[in-house]
Design a protein with these regions (language model features):
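Extended, non-globular or repeat-rich regions with surface exposure
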Residues: 25-29, 33-36, 96-106
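Extracytoplasmic electron-transfer domains, predominantly the class I c-type cytochrome c fold
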Residues: 55-107
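N-terminal export/targeting leaders of redox proteins
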Residues: 1-26, 107
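Sequence/structural segment immediately N-terminal to covalent heme-attachment motifs in c-type
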Residues: 27-48, 63, 77
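Short N-terminal micro-motifs specific to bacterial/archaeal maturation
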Residues: 16, 23, 33-36, 62, ...
Length: 107
């Protein structure tokens, strides 16, 4: 009986932590989408289907499917005609938009 109770408690704790992690990931995704569409104005130049953007100045993010590190580097430092956003966007906003783009581009 004690073992059954311990298994129940550990399963319950796992589910609680999993839901907290999921909520944080959803919050980060939504913040990233907001940055993509508004603060960063990424949609003005990039195509990303999830954001409903169909611009042709920068690369189509659905086609190149960049990983998080590549996105962070490009957003912070700029690349080609894309301006550096470090100092314009906070580190939190840069991480959020990188998270959003990396997940959305995979779909």
């Amino acid at each position: 009986m004690k073992k059954l109770f311990l298994n129940f408690c550990s399963t319950l704790l796992f589910l609680i932590f999993a839901s907290i992690i999921r909520a944080n990931a959803d919050e980060l995704f939504n913040k990233g989408k907001e940055v993509f569409l508004e603060a960063g104005n990424c949609a003005a130049c990039h195509t990303l289907y999830d954001a409903g953007s169909n611009a042709m100045i920068g690369p189509n993010l659905n086609e190149i499917r960049p990983d998080i590190q590549r996105i962070i580097m490009a957003v912070r430092n700029g690349i080609g005609v894309m301006p550096a956003m470090e100092g314009i966007l906070s580190d939190e906003e840069i991480e959020a938009v990188a998270h959003y783009v990396s997940i959305s581009a995979e779909q």
